[in-house]
Amino acid sequence: MAAQPRGGDYRGFFLLSILLGTPWEAWAGRILYSVSEETDKGSFVGDIAKDLGLEPRELAERGVRIISRGRTQLFALNQRSGSLVTAGRIDREEICAQSARCLVNFNILMEDKMNLYPIDVEIIDINDNVPRFLTEEINVKIMENTAPGVRFPLSEAGDPDVGTNSLQSYQLSPNRHFSLAVQSGDDETKYPELVLERVLDREEERVHHLVLTASDGGDPPRSSTAHIQVTVVDVNDHTPVFSLPQYQVTVPENVPVGTRLLTVHAIDLDEGVNGEVTYSFRKITPKLPKMFHLNSLTGEISTLEGLDYEETAFYEMEVQAQDGPGSLTKAKVLITVLDVNDNAPEVTMTSLSSSIPEDTPLGTVIALFYLQDRDSGKNGEVTCTIPENLPFKLEKSIDNYYRLVTTKNLDRETLSLYNITLKATDGGTPPLSRETHIFMQVADTNDNPPTFPHSSYSVYIAENNPRGASIFLVTAQDHDSEDNAQITYSLAEDTIQGAPVSSYVSINSDTGVLYALQSFDYEQLRELQLRVTAHDSGDPPLSSNMSLSLFVLDQNDNPPEILYPALPTDGSTGMELAPRSAEPGYLVTKVVAVDKDSGQNAWLSYLLLKASEPGLFAVGLYTGEVRTARALLDRDALKQSLVVAVQDHGQPPLSATVTLTVAVADSIPEVLADLGSLEPSDGPYNYDLTLYLVVAVATVSCVFLAFVLVLLALRLRRWHKSRLLQASEGGLANVPTSHFVGMDGVQAFLQTYSHEVSLTADSRKSHLIFPQPNYVDMLISQESCEKNDSLLTSVDFQECKENLPSIQQAPPNTDWRFSQAQRPGTSGSQNGDDTGTWPNNQFDTEMLQAMILASASEAADGSSTLGGGAGTMGLSARYGPQFTLQHVPDYRQNVYIPGSNATLTNAAGKRDGKAPAGGNGNKKKSGKKEKK
């Protein structure tokens, strides 16, 4: 059945509220539908989608559903058609009894916005009930002397239907003694009465049988009958009379069972049996005999069951008093039940979200519930509260509906579960309350990035580590949960020395363990700067970075490397020159060594292991300087052999040795003469001496020509390098000198004097060689390490410690640096007296040729053996570049002597203790020139 026009009016209000943006709850009206009772399940009631201004498909999308307060769901929503239909058979009499109008009210909830819309459905009565008498046999006793016109009440029929479908009329079967009169009460109930039309004669007819028919006004009408048996008795002049025509009593609903409510009382003036009055219920529903008891003798009415105001608040019944012969009268009894506060409030959850995300906006509805109290008046007035320290509040909706909404931002990391206590309290005395707990889980959102305990770390690993070794454990924490807290680790893409970081180290993405992918070499790589990123698995993922400095620790894996004297490529031994006039402390040469390691592993000490003449020479423990320990004697051999050991201070220490050959003579010719005198006068090879001499002369000529060409090339190269150094001098000016071991000057010296002419002393056949240039790797810049260990070891250098003079530590100075005159180069470009001389004119060249020819002649005579060292090129002190410290850049700026205040210097006075002999060499050269 379609909605009545009144429903259409509300529909108009609803549509108007949508157009104006006004919530439906603001309208005071309700949507009204009507439907007949006893319709089939699924019968159409109204187009709810249209009346709500929705499309049928939107009912499911927006969560539209019915909220009913009763226990039985009478109606349902057809989601496909958008209509309101019956959920089953509806019996109007069961729902509304005999109320004139039967309205069923419920609410429609739209869950997406938590809005409620009140709905009323009127149940239309149909004629589905037949009027029925409480008893099919009605017994009436009438005295035979009863005057005509006396009326006798009859039991009325009941019809649960209402309106025209209810009881409308009574009919009495035709007879000559009685007629029927119908009376209407205040509630429009029709009461049949039997009217005596003629005097009865008991002797004529003792019993009269009549039929009473009750009919309703339905279409078609329905009816039922009752049999009336009228018994004619002897004369009974008086009928019982009640003391009150109507009895009223008010009792609280919590009276105990068996409580006497009231007593009805009737008086019969007759005597004997005619005056004995009995009481009985006359007009009651089937439920009343179970609720109340009427004492037939005393007229007391008491309770058989407990009263419940919430179920029935008012009872109406009729009692009759009858004497012995059968005369009776009636009275009405009204029982009013008073409400007491015996029902606690009830909370009915309509909609509840058990879990909400922590980033839920403020004002979000998380629960919708209904409060009710079955009591009445103040006993039924309910208030609801929640604790004040929660980020929620209550908002009242229509009727007794409440919303629970958020008032503050939620944070799962602070509190992940809320136990919300709803306390509903009524207004009774004393008040009753009921608590309902709502457990609200706060769902996690990815709002916390992973965090490291520190923003940067320093990690150390010793070099020569095995591949795959674990270096460090990186850990990060994420305060989120589940996938949002799953952390993966990664290394930022970067390059180190032209190679990607992933070729050096790797990280386990799950555990954060950092692994070495290669064995590190301190001399090649000392530090790696890494950036570790921690990602969580949220959506979108969050990350944080941490910087990690990986330092490679040095190990003593490199032995000392001797830079000077360098080993000749032909296997010969270099020779150094010591004049016989040298005083004690005269600097003969200097052993220069470096160690690619750093710190204590690179601290070097020098020791004279073996000498052909013990006590003649001494080696500086930290400087490597070879000096005369005493004055040279005539008995000292011309050729002295020294074995010098260089050892670092690592654990375990590593060492290297070098063999030095020192010629004791004042000049090269003297060396040649002395060496020639040592050779035997004749030998097995004299027969080809002439051939050797010819070959030697030719060779010397070729060598001289090559020497001149090489000398010119070196000059050009030096000039070119000087230009480059001047251009780059500004870039190197800011580099601290402490960052270099001191090898650059040595390398420059070796590059300058790498071309040597060497005459072997071990072969009878003298020859010339051109050694290959020496190439020295540049040392890696390193920071000095602070150590407390002694520079000397207690095992290898014990005896050196005993002879080591105490040295006072002094601040470093720069007097060891080369002057312009001390830098390597040809003698012609230098003017100092302390520098070695080179042939720089024709006379010197002729002298060199003459000396070589003389040497060749002596070799042909078998009277001498020429020998040359790498430092002298096999020539005399006059023509050979006398090796002094001016030619070798000092590295002692990087040498720290533990426990002393001395800083190694290169001052000529400190080194030799006397003026250099370079000036004498120049004088000799001038004398020879004049002589020639």
From Swiss-Prot:
Region Disordered, annotated ranges: 805-841, 902-932
Biased composition (Basic residues): 922-932
Membrane topology (Cytoplasmic): 714-932
Domain Cadherin positions: 29-133, 134-242, 243-347, 348-452, 453-562, 570-682
Pfam families: Cadherin, Cadherin_2, Cadherin_C_2, Cadherin_tail
TM regions (residue ranges): 693-713
Descriptive protein name: Protocadherin gamma-A7
Organism: Homo sapiens (Human)
Gene symbol of the encoding locus: PCDHGA7
